[in-house]
Amino acid sequence: MDVNQPKQEHLLALKVMRLTKPTLFTNIPVTCEEKDLPGDLFSTLMKDDPSTVKGAEILMLGEMLTLPQNFGNIFLGETFSSYISVHNDSNQVVKDVQVKADLQTSSQRLNLSASSAVVADLKPDSCIDDVIHHEVKEIGTHILVCAVSYTIQSGEKMYFRKFFKFQVLKPLDVKTKFYNAETDEVFLEAQIQNITTSPMFMEKVSLEPSIMYNVSELNTVITNGDWKGSSTFGTKTYLQPLDTRQYLYCLKPKPEFAEKAGVIKGVTVIGKLDIVWKTNLGERGRLQTSQLQRMAPGYGDVRLSIETIPDTVRLEEPFDITCKITNCSSERTMDLVLEMCNTNAIHWSGVSGRQLGKLHPSSSLHLTLTLLSSVQGLQSVSGLRLTDTFLKRTYEYDDIAQVCVVSSKLQAES
């Protein structure tokens, strides 16, 4: 939309054109039956038309390229490029010509002029050309303000402006979900939907983690001999309009932070997504989300997690598990007592009610326990109780892990 000031006779003319990639020319084929009145007239005209594909004239898509006929859509993350030309339409020399281009957004005003130098003399039929570029980082209304100032031969200073308004639209709809694992791992599921009217080539979708985490992408399938793996989306990574794609990432605490239970517990900032795509004829767009935040998991004052446990055990034969007990409090030292309560299927081996000693804030201890199962099948490990003798508070831990119990005879045969 071009909103100009009241018309005034100026010696200079300002032209602004948005620079975009050309598109393939399309035409509407008109055909008829051979017995109809036109006969082969339409087919002959289409064969002579240079915009049609030879041998496939009835296809709407041609081989010729066409320049944009209108301003078109601009999406967040794309680069806005424009060609600005100031031409001297008069028959006299104009002095001290200066061209300035600003971009006004809802929050700021940016100077896009490549050079602010003043042109001393602009002869008749001469012009000043400039190309501006700007990576669009805000949605909503944008106004390109082009201002021209110059001095005519009489010494009078002249000035005029032109305004070009355009809307920046949102290209992608990004939704995220977090899943907190017992091992301090965080799984991020990112759903990305193409809300434009044209397909996109998804060049890169990566997660830049915060300083406390390492990230691994779970969007590839490892095949025989291919250590790099292949994409779960196949070789053609096009995202059609209104299609949605899901990406999965696993974040693990770095070793220097993994033992600091209180620090990891309170971390809410996970990182940010970096998305790069291409549209028609390779036009690139890039979008970075703001810092993604999760709800901090509530482990309570004491956290018990399983470090090692066998997948399969024999019926009525002892096996060992390793537990990690963490004091999640940042201020209080705990004096813990461990009690082991048998269930219908799980029986603990050892002394119940033993002292574990003092556990300082944000510190952990590892504990190896022995148990056996009297029932076959998939059994849940339950029955652990931790009592803080200072506060006389008991913490119950049930269904902390699962183990497959098979008979000794079955395992021997396998």
UniProtKB/Swiss-Prot annotation:
Coiled coil: none annotated. GO terms for cellular component: TRAPPIII protein complex. The gene is trappc13. Belongs to the TRAPPC13 family. Part of the multisubunit TRAPP (transport protein particle) complex. InterPro entries: TRAPPC13, TRAPPC13_C, TRAPPC13_M, TRAPPC13_N. Pfam families: TRAPPC13_C, TRAPPC13_M, TRAPPC13_N. This is Trafficking protein particle complex subunit 13.
